[in-house]
Amino acid sequence: MHDQIDDGDRAFIEARDMFFIATTDEDGQPQSSYKGGEPGFVRVLDEKTIAFPLYDGNGMYLTAGNLMTTKKVGLLFIDFEGRKRMRLNGVASVADDDPLLAEFPEAQLIVRVSATEVFPNCPRYIHEYKLVKRSRFVPKRECETPVPQWKQSEWAHDVLPENDPANDPSREVIPRG
């Protein structure tokens, strides 16, 4: 276990297209979430700091809200094909005016995490999976992201922010996602 991100850690993190994130609210209630993007969407900025975008989601902002209040975070990066994983724990900050926002199309916020613990995790029970296809909902610079159909449901309209892409009638809506 170490408190800095070395070159091997950097290469592993920046090659990932997803990770799991754990946070807690001010009452200590845990939340976990999956975050996905194109490989490299998590950036290692220096030996102590990583950054990643938060895209639109279900409108509940549980991850962002928890990071803004308790700041503690646990991240789990997994390479399912190579059967390797690592953990990074740290202290997070969330910003809607971070200069990195310009580098991530459609990102709403940037999370920066200052690493307190970085360590490999036992790969013994990792099931081998093969990537079939990347999600078409991951924002890309060259095209507008379609809206998942679930965002058109009645319950979603109650929680989605006014500026959510689902509220734009000109956006393409597709059934999966």
Where are these regions (language model features)?
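Binding-site signature for planar aromatic cofactors or substrates
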Residues: 1-177
